[in-house]
Amino acid sequence: MSAWWAMGQQRVEIHKLRQGENLILGFSIGGGIDQDPSQNPFSEDKTDKGIYVTRVSEGGPAEIAGLQIGDKIMQVNGWDMTMVTHDQARKRLTKRSEEVVRLLVTRQSLQKAVQQSMLS
């Protein structure tokens, strides 16, 4: 795992696990501009249409890399993920030609820690 923090964001590098013909990331996503944000349990104001991590498989590549449930995915391998549909996000994450996925995520606990340190 390689990670760094800046203003509430973290970089997470996931090495996909090969299982036969499939490359496994070990996490699921929810959200997207085509989804109802009021159904997103991670959106604090219920208007955020971002892409969020909804499940992380125990012992899988994502957990090993440090990804957490509730992380908001801002970028995938340099691609902006802030205004994409759920299907566009899924396709970007599961590209067969990419064995490593580099994510830029926002984590609520990181955001709160940064905000509190700025107030101190």
Language model feature labels by segment:
Residues 5-7, 22, 46-50, 67-69, ...:
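Generic preference for well-ordered alpha-helical elements
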Residues 2-23, 28-30, 90-120:
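PDZ-domain C-terminal substructure recognizer with occasional recognition of PDZ-binding tails
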